[in-house]
């Protein structure tokens, strides 16, 4: 339901299909009759389906309805998890200590629930030995396998090879 719904005198249609506060259809009524019925019940006449023939109007407490709608929207936004992709850059000739540091960072990201993209950039003639980069990425994935699943296997993209790891349980 849109935020700018037509209410009471804002409704331009001459006739509306009327639904009361209990959800029962009262049939096609003139706008004036529908407004009078809504006024007697101390409620608002809200146009819920303006494109229908004739348009559908419902008798309800519009203020309460808007409040409930805002609460639902807020709850939906709160439950929405933003997926963050972190990147760890390696090289085909990475030293053991550097590898361990990068691995520790990646494990920290995975524990937080973030995805990790591990990339290796081949410089100069190193591109001729792609299998070395493949081994480094395989070793990296093997070291993290208790925390993650491999979302995308090692793949070449230009002068880079990358692998995407996703956490086992996203928090």
From Swiss-Prot:
Compartment(s) of residence: Cytoplasm
GO biological process: ribosome disassembly
Source organism: Listeria innocua serovar 6a (strain ATCC BAA-680 / CLIP 11262)
Function, in words: IF-3 binds to the 30S ribosomal subunit and shifts the equilibrium between 70S ribosomes and their 50S and 30S subunits in favor of the free subunits, thus enhancing the availability of 30S subunits on which protein synthesis initiation begins.
GO MF term set: ribosome binding; translation initiation factor activity
Pfam family, one: IF3_N
Protein's name according to its UniProt entry: Translation initiation factor IF-3
Family: Belongs to the IF-3 family.
rRNA-binding as UniProt keyword: no
Listed PANTHER family: TRANSLATION INITIATION FACTOR IF-3, TRANSLATION INITIATION FACTOR IF-3, MITOCHONDRIAL
Gene name tied to this protein: infC
Membrane-spanning intervals of the chain: none
GO cellular component terms attached to this protein's record: cytosol; membrane
Keywords from the named record: Cytoplasm, Initiation factor, Protein biosynthesis
Subunit structure: Monomer.
């Amino acid at each position: 339901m849109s935020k700018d719904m037509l209410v009471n005198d804002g409704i331009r249609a001459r006739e509306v299909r009327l639904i009361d506060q209990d959800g029962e259809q009262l049939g096609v009524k003139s706008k004036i009759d529908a407004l009078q019925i809504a006024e007697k019940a101390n409620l608002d006449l809200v146009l819920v389906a303006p494109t229908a023939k004739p348009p559908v109007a419902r008798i309800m407490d519009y203020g309460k309805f808007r409040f409930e709608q805002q609460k639902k929207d807020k709850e939906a936004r709160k439950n929405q998890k933003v997926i963050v992709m972190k990147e760890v850059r390696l090289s085909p000739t990475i030293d053991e200590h550097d590898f361990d540091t990068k691995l520790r960072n990646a494990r920290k990201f995975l524990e937080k629930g973030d995805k990790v993209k591990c990339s290796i950039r081949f410089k100069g003639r190193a591109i001729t030995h792609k299998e070395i980069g493949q081994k480094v990425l395989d070793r990296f994935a093997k070291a993290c396998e208790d925390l993650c699943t491999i979302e995308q296997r090692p793949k070449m993209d230009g002068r880079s090879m990358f692998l995407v790891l996703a956490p086992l349980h996203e928090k």
